[in-house]
Amino acid sequence: MNILLMQRIVSFILVVSQGRYFHVGELTMTMLKRPQEEESDNNATKKLKTRLTYPCILGKDKVTGKFIFPAITKDDVMNARLFLKDNDLKTFLEYFLPVEVNSIYIYFMIKLLGFDVKDKELFMALNSNITSNKERSSAELSSIHAKAEDEDELTDPLEKKHAVKLIKDLQKAINKVLSTRLRLPNFNTIDHFTATLRNAKKILVLTGAGVSTSLGIPDFRSSEGFYSKIRHLGLEDPQDVFNLDIFLQDPSVFYNIAHMVLPPENMYSPLHSFIKMLQDKGKLLRNYTQNIDNLESYAGIDPDKLVQCHGSFATASCVTCHWQIPGEKIFENIRNLELPLCPYCYQKRKQYFPMSNGNNTVQTNINFNSPILKSYGVLKPDMTFFGEALPSRFHKTIRKDILECDLLICIGTSLKVAPVSEIVNMVPSHVPQILINRDMVTHAEFDLNLLGFCDDVASLVAKKCHWDIPHKKWQDLKKIDYNCTEIDKGTYKIKKQPRKKQQ
C-alpha cells in the first residue's frame, strides 16, 4: 500500500463523511462549529507528553512474523485526538503515518484514537498478525522495521474485505473524535471544581434517576430498578409500559404498575436541596431533569429555573379532550389501581363501553371489543412516553442555555437517552464538565468524575465550599467525613468514612 492508496483512504473517509463532519474540497476537513462558540485559551489544545515518535513505523517480530505494536498510553490518545481536532484530516494522516503503509497501520490509527474494532472475524484476523511490545519505544521498533524493509515486510497480511472494514472503522473513529469534546487539560481535581463553582454564575445542571434513589424511588435501568421488577408482567420489553401506542390501545398496562413509580409527596433529597442552594446563590442557570417525579418543585426550585425534559406527574391530561388537572388529583386513582377518567368525556365513554357500567377499575377495562380506543376519556400523567415528542420548552431553552452556561454538572444520569444525552456535546468545549454519579459514563468526556452516592458528593462539595445545604438532614450530613480516592486522572471515588466506635 503506497501514498496513492493512503490518499484514496483520505478521499474515502471524506466522501463517506460528507455532510457530517467533513466536506470534500482539496482533501480538507472543516469541523462543524457550534453557533457563536467562543474561542478560548482554555480549549484543549495543549500537547501532552508522549513516548511515541511520528510517523510511527511498525516493526516485525523476526521469529513470529507478527507486527509489533508499541504501547499506546492515554496521553498518546489525547495527543492524537488534539492533533486531529486542530488540523485537517490530510495533515493528520500524513503526520502520523509513514508514506508506505498496509492495513495494520489503519488499525494502529484506530487504536491511537482510543478505539478498537468490534467485528469478531476482523479482530481475530488482526490478532493473528499483531503482537504488542510494551517495553520498546516507537523509535526502537522503527529501527527493527527499517532493517527488514528489503524483505517486503509491507505486504498486507489481511484480506481485502478486512482492509475495507478497517477503513470504515477508522472513519467512524474520526467522526466520533470530531463530534465529542475533549477533556480540559488543566481541570481534573476537586479543588478545580470547587474554585470554579464559587465563581460560576450560570451553571447548567443535568439530573437523572440517581438524584432520587436515596428516597426509595427506583432507577428504571439499574439491576434492582423498576424494569427488573416488572418482568413478571410478561412484556416483551419492560419499557412498553411507557409506550404511547400501547397506552392508547390499553391504558391498563400502565395503570397496573403506575403505583410503583408514583413519587412521594413533599419529599426531596439533599441533592435536590444542593441545586436549590445554587439557585439561592444566583448561580443556577437551569436544571434540566430527566426525572418524572417532580421532586425539584418540592425542593423549591423555581419553575423558570426548571426544565422537566421528560414531563412529570405534576399535571395530568385527558388523552381525548386534553382537559388538564394537577397531577396529585389522580394519585388516589393510581394507588387504587383505577383508571382516572375525564368528567367531560365520561358519559360518552359509558356509551362506548356499556359493559363497564361506569366502573373505572383497571381490570374491567382490559378486554373490550369496541373499535374505540380503550384510552377514550382516560387521564394520562403529562410525562413523555416513548413515541412522544419532548416538551417544547426543552427545545426553546436549551439552544440559549448551552451558549450562556459557564459550568455543566451532570448528576445521577447514565446519559443513555437522546436528545438529553447530547447536551454534553452541545456545550462549548471550553466550559468545564463534571459528572457526579455512582458509575462512570464512558461514552462522554467529563473533565472530572466524582463517583459515589449523589447526596454524599453534594455534601462533600458543599463542605469544601463552606456552604450550607438547605435540607433538614444537613446538620447531620455536615458532621460526616469522606474518603476521596483518586482511581484515575480526573476520577475520584467518594465514600463516607466509617464512624469510629465509641469506647
Swiss-Prot record:
Cofactors demanded by this protein: Zn(2+)
Enzyme Commission no: 2.3.1.286
Binding locations of Zn(2+): 318, 321, 342, 345
Primary subcellular site in the record, as a coarse category: nucleus
Disulphide linkage map: none
GO BP term (any one): cellular response to starvation
Pfam families according to UniProt: DUF592, SIR2
Keyword field: Chromatin regulator, Metal-binding, NAD, Nucleus, Repressor, Sporulation, Transcription, Transcription regulation, Transferase, Zinc
Something else known: Present with 1440 molecules/cell in log phase SD medium.
Function: NAD-dependent histone deacetylase involved in telomeric silencing. Histone deacetylase proteins act via the formation of large multiprotein complexes that are responsible for the deacetylation of lysine residues on the N-terminal part of the core histones (H2A, H2B, H3 and H4). Histone deacetylation gives a tag for epigenetic repression and plays an important role in transcriptional regulation, cell cycle progression and developmental events. Restores silencing at HMR in SIR2 mutants when overexpressed. Required to repress middle sporulation genes during vegetative growth.
Family statement drawn from the similarity comment of this UniProt entry: Belongs to the sirtuin family. Class I subfamily.
Protein name (database record): NAD-dependent protein deacetylase HST1
Organism field: Saccharomyces cerevisiae (strain ATCC 204508 / S288c) (Baker's yeast)
Lineage: Eukaryota, Fungi, Dikarya, Ascomycota, Saccharomycotina
